[in-house]
């Protein structure tokens, strides 16, 4: 895996391997990021040390985050095995411009044995000029599905129907346009930047992220002294609002079936915890780092390579918000424990009116704490104005 450039990562399992000496942290507290850090090839125990750079010790010093460690260890172990299996797929060698990455609970380092595998394919070029032969993709898919089954992962969603290839150049050229939504480019891009974890071809994975970030920084050269990543922040807010609207739209078509209603309560519950965390951990971190100076693209790369909780842990440490962090972690671990079961069991759990009332009360409390941290890092700036207007 490719180690993140001195990333904002407090002890998380991954994104690279072989840990080298931690770069120095300047007195400003801003992360120092080498242009092209060395790439590793295996994770194992190093996975817990790598994606951290100078922030590793920070994590160890924060007992408020200790409750998250078991999930990170589980993800490290499972992803190590999956990466090893994927590296054995011979057909992938024939496609050097292809990388694979995980999103969802594995990308957030919070998966349980019941978590789905959300695997994405990203190709460096365009569909028109670089489309894989159908037989190539079929062989890769078959080997990937067989490997996931052999390792005991749950069946891929829809029997693998989402294992389509996304093409980087198509996504970048369609950013903000009609095809952005129609081709699912928007979702693929947001998940890559907010909660992804490389599975294969780490070097290309990092190149893809750099290319995506460059799209948001296209005006940087004209505003080097006062540039703000408003374009990126707007895209995140759009993603959050889209997920909220999609939930409401699906409710319009709900059949008169208590089980289906319970499943949608469960989706809403997860939206208010994991999706909220994914989006606003990045917003909070960007606002925080932008207070001191212009946020460089290399610093945004470090934020992308960090997990959602790694972003929040560093912000909390830097702003004296450890008590607030501890409250958020307690609520989030309760959420993780409550949903660590098959979907049918979780749906039955939340179908109980009293339990559901308590669950959504805690979700509201979690959202309130996240907003408090956002207000804290935005205080004295016009950051909230740009998020709202």
Regions found by a protein language model. Give the residues of each.
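Conserved catalytic core of two-metal-ion nucleotidyltransferases
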Residues: 73-93, 129-232
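Conserved aromatic-histidine-acidic binding/catalytic patches
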Residues: 67-70, 74, 112, 124-132, ...
């Amino acid at each position: 895996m490719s180690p993140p450039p001195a990333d904002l990562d407090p002890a998380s399992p991954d994104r690279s391997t072989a840990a080298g000496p931690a770069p120095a942290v300047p007195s400003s507290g801003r992360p120092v990021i080498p242009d092209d850090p060395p790439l590793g090839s295996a994770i194992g125990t190093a996975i817990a040390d790598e994606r951290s750079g100078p922030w590793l010790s920070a994590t160890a010093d924060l007992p408020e985050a200790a409750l998250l460690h078991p999930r990170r260890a589980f993800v490290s172990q499972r992803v190590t095995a999956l990466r090893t299996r994927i590296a054995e797929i011979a057909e992938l060698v024939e496609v050097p411009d292809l990388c694979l990455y995980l999103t969802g609970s594995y990308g957030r380092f919070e998966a349980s044995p019941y978590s789905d595998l959300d695997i994405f394919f990203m190709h460096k070029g365009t569909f028109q000029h670089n489309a894989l032969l159908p037989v190539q993709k079929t062989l890769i898919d078959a080997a990937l599905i067989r490997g996931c089954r052999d390792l005991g992962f749950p069946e891929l969603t829809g029997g693998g129907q989402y294992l389509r290839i996304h093409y980087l150049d198509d996504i970048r050229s369609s950013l903000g346009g009609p095809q952005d939504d129609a081709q699912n480019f928007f979702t693929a891009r947001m998940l890559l930047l907010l909660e992804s974890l490389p599975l294969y071809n780490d070097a290309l994975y990092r190149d893809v992220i750099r290319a995506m970030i460059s799209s948001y920084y296209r005006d940087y050269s004209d505003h080097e002294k006062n540039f703000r990543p408003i374009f990126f922040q707007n895209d995140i807010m759009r993603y959050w609002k889209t997920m909220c609207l999609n939930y409401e739209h699906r409710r319009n078509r709900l059949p008169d079936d208590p089980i289906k209603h319970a499943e949608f309560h469960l989706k809403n519950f997860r939206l208010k915890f994991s999706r909220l965390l994914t989006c606003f951990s990045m917003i909070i971190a960007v606002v925080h780092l932008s207070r001191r100076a212009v946020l460089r693209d290399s610093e945004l790369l470090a934020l992308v390579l960090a997990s959602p909780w790694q972003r929040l842990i560093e912000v909390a440490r830097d702003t004296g918000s450890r008590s607030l962090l501890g409250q958020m972690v307690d609520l989030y671990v309760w959420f993780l424990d409550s949903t660590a079961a098959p979907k049918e069991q979780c749906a039955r759990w939340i179908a109980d009116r009293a339990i559901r009332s308590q669950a959504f009360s805690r979700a509201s409390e979690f959202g309130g704490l996240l907003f408090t941290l956002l207000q804290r890092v935005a205080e004295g700036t016009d950051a909230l104005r740009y998020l709202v207007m």
